[in-house]
């Protein structure tokens, strides 16, 4: 979160002068716009640093079952699983519901997991789902300044 240190220095006093309901509205707007940005980036199959995701492992030709043709994480980044929360103190985004937090953390950090069919250990490459891009930081600054001008 070091990239937000400059926000703290410049805007802390101004943000604290807002009423609690104003801060909650600001954090709700920030969370909503950040979720949209994350969803667009994940649908483009890109990490926050702009590199493309590692492709899925190839399945053998004989095993046509189990093939997945849609883009990775298409369902995981919907608002059903990617929840936002806003309060006067903070805005947060988290994966919620069923297996989605575990799936997201395995791919975010490139962990290994046991296959549920045959018990083999599978090493997943890191595919960061959440993170800040340069455009996200700029968007946050613009939203805060626009909200303070109202």
Curated annotation (Swiss-Prot):
Cysteine disulfide links: none
Protein name: Tail completion protein S
Family matches, as InterPro entries: Phage_virion_morphogenesis (IPR006522)
Region (Disordered): 32-66
Source taxon at top rank: Viruses
Role noted for this protein: It is proposed that R and S are tail completion proteins that are essential for stable head joining.
NCBIfam families xrefs: tail_comp_S (TIGR01635)
């Amino acid at each position: 979160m070091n990239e937000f240190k400059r926000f703290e220095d410049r805007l802390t006093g101004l943000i604290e002068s807002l009423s609690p309901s104003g801060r909650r509205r600001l954090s709700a707007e920030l969370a909503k716009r950040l979720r949209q940005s994350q969803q667009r980036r994940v649908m483009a199959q890109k990490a926050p640093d702009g590199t493309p995701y590692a492709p899925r492992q190839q399945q053998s030709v004989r095993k046509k079952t189990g093939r997945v043709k849609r883009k990775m994480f298409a369902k995981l980044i919907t608002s059903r699983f990617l929840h936002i929360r806003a309060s006067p103190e903070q805005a947060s985004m988290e994966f919620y519901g069923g297996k989605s937090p575990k799936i997201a953390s395995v791919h975010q950090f490139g962990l290994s997991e046991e296959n549920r069919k045959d018990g083999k250990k599978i090493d997943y490459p890191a595919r960061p789902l959440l993170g800040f891009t340069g455009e996200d930081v700029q968007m946050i600054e613009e939203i805060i300044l626009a909200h303070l001008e109202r």
